[in-house]
Amino acid sequence: MASSVSGAEEVRVSALTPLKLVGLVCVFLALCLDVGAVLSPAWVTADDQYHLSLWKSCSKPAASATWRCNSTLGTDWQIATLALLLGGAFLILLSFLVALVSVCIRSRRRFYRPVAIMLFAAVVLQACCLVLYPIKFIETISLRIYHEFNWGYGLAWGATIFSFGGAILYCLNPKNYEDYY
């Protein structure tokens, strides 16, 4: 968007482009999904006899009506999974705050690259977490009943996908398309 000032001088005003706004919405959704994934009580469930989250593991013997719960922070792979997911969530939070601040001030372009880099780093951390979790779960915990990865695990994948989408949108060069808006 260009406007003329005092006849001959032209000033460029940085407008918020729709793709950056959609990127900000993607980052916000990723943040919300990450919070849901971290707080979820159901990453793995098995026929109302076993529940595993990032924080605790609960099992109920078939003959009993009471659940026995233990902390999952005793094994290395579960601590690593939690650390990778929380690290990615922290980077998503930081990139959301930087992107939000960049919307409020005039010089937005200089914040696009750091936001995209933080989001790509969050995607790498969370993808490592989401690949590590089922591999180590199947390797270390032997359930003789049908089990499935539940909605908490799915929320974490959703957060990773939205983070990747936001990172792609923040990588797009606004110089190529901002004259059309």
Curated annotation (Swiss-Prot):
It comes from the Eukaryota. It is found in: Membrane; Cell junction, Adherens junction. GO terms for cellular component: adherens junction; cell-cell junction; membrane. Keywords: Cell junction, Membrane, Transmembrane, Transmembrane helix. It is a multi-pass membrane protein. InterPro entries: P53_induced (IPR015664), PMP22/EMP/MP20/Claudin (IPR004031). Gene3D superfamilies: 1.20.140.150. The chain crosses the membrane at residues 21-41, 81-101, 115-135, 152-172. Its main location: membrane. Signal peptide: none annotated. One of its GO terms (biological process) is cell-cell adhesion. PANTHER family: P53-INDUCED PROTEIN RELATED (PTHR14399), TRANSMEMBRANE PROTEIN 47 (PTHR14399:SF3). Belongs to the TMEM47 family. Regulates cell junction organization in epithelial cells. This is Transmembrane protein 47. It comes from Danio rerio. The gene is tmem47.
